[in-house]
Amino acid sequence: MRKLRRLVHMVLFCPISKGLQSRLPGIKVKYLFLAWLSVFVGSWVVYMHYSSYSELCRGHVCRMIICDQYKKGIISGSACKDLCDERTLVFQQCLSSSPTQQVYSGRWRDREVIIKCGVEETLKADSNPDSPPRRELVLFDKPTRGTSMDEFKEMLGNFLKANLGEQVSLTALVSQILTMADVNNDGKVSLAEAKSIWALLHLNEILLMLSLREKEHTSQLLGHCGDLYVTEKIPHDSLYGSQIPGFLQTLLPSPVHRLVHQWCAPAWPRRAKIAIGLLEFVEEIFHGTYGSFFICDSSFKNIGYNEKYDFKVVDLRKVATEMTIRGFLKGRHCEQNSDCTFGSDCTAACDKLMKQCRNDVIQPNLAKACQLLQDYLLYGSPSDLREELQKQLRTCMTLSGLASQMEVHHSLILNNLKTLLWKKISNTKYS
């Protein structure tokens, strides 16, 4: 014990000479206070981290809610048996950013997956996370018992029309949804199967996954149970391959962020391939099979790629249909353009005279994509390409106004940029 006291005395007081201590008698108290403050701050950080984790990560609540409703026969799905009976759908690392939207990495059928489910209604009903689930009273109330197959088809058609607009291909999408709902492949859709697919469709990401299912740049939907769903895991969930930890992002200045990103980013030819994939995705959603879609969070954190450096959208919840945005803007009061913003950056103009938002987004998807690609592609780019690449990206970033009114110009810029990049990496191992 005496040795321990000596060690503490040496650590706290030896850096200060005895002469200085005699001149500054309060220095010992200051050192003790600093030591106590360090312990207090460290304990507070640990406590806050634990509290934040326990608040955000409620995978056990998610499983409890879903499995309770599955065992009652209220819901169904292709992943229910593995989740609730055999427990081969395993929750692993918590990735949630909101307590009402649970996101976990996991493992299912010998592959890495992402598991997502919502617990909002349960938390609203009772602050105790272990209380009996009552969410089926709110979420799984449609269709009601006695609804015929034709009536359910009509429900689906009207829902898709309201969210995707008048599209000639909606009938095919309804058939695709009914096939997905028929989990046991008996050619019929039970009430539990219908309730599950109806709840699932009300999740923006699922609606977009089904609408963009034929596109190679979105995550594949692997299974569901009620409104819990499982998607493929994207190996690299950031444009730069890795992300700076959250607690460091606020501490480090933006120039340091840029240096870290450049250091972690793939080689330039691989970045060019990823960029081509992003441009192809922008092209696909510009006037797709099921209407137009808008990227409403153009952060590099929402763009990833797989082992082959093929572009992948990390989170389709950040993408919105044209009908969704128009519904948000319709009749909306505004004082300035920022009042007309859906998501992070889908902004329409504010009519200052009428004090209402206009219906059309100012900045098209392509301009947002080019803003992301400017730093991403120019750093380390081949010298014989840099000047022309910079020129085309600058032109691309100036795109604005109603995209449908400048479709030819939009397509020309996109194709020129794709061609420029593809010529540089074609006939190489990177292509």
From Swiss-Prot:
Top-level taxonomic group: Eukaryota
Modification note: Among the many cysteines in the lumenal domain, most are probably involved in disulfide bonds.
Compartment(s): Endoplasmic reticulum membrane
Residue intervals on the Cytoplasmic side: 1-30
SUPFAM superfamilies assigned to the protein according to its UniProt record, in alphabetical order: EF-hand (SSF47473)
Disulfide feature: C57-C94, C62-C117
InterPro entries linked: EF-hand-dom_pair (IPR011992), FAM69_kinase_dom (IPR022049), FAM69_N (IPR029244)
Membrane topology (UniProt): Single-pass type II membrane protein
Keyword vocabulary terms for this entry: Disulfide bond, Endoplasmic reticulum, Membrane, Signal-anchor, Transmembrane, Transmembrane helix
Transmembrane segments: 31-51
Lumenal side: 52-431
Motif (May mediate ER retention): 5-6
Any single GO CC term annotated in Swiss-Prot or TrEMBL for this entry: endoplasmic reticulum membrane
Pfam families: PIP49_C, PIP49_N
Family in the record: Belongs to the DIPK family.
Protein name: Divergent protein kinase domain 1B
Species: Xenopus tropicalis
Source lineage: Eukaryota, Metazoa, Chordata, Craniata, Vertebrata
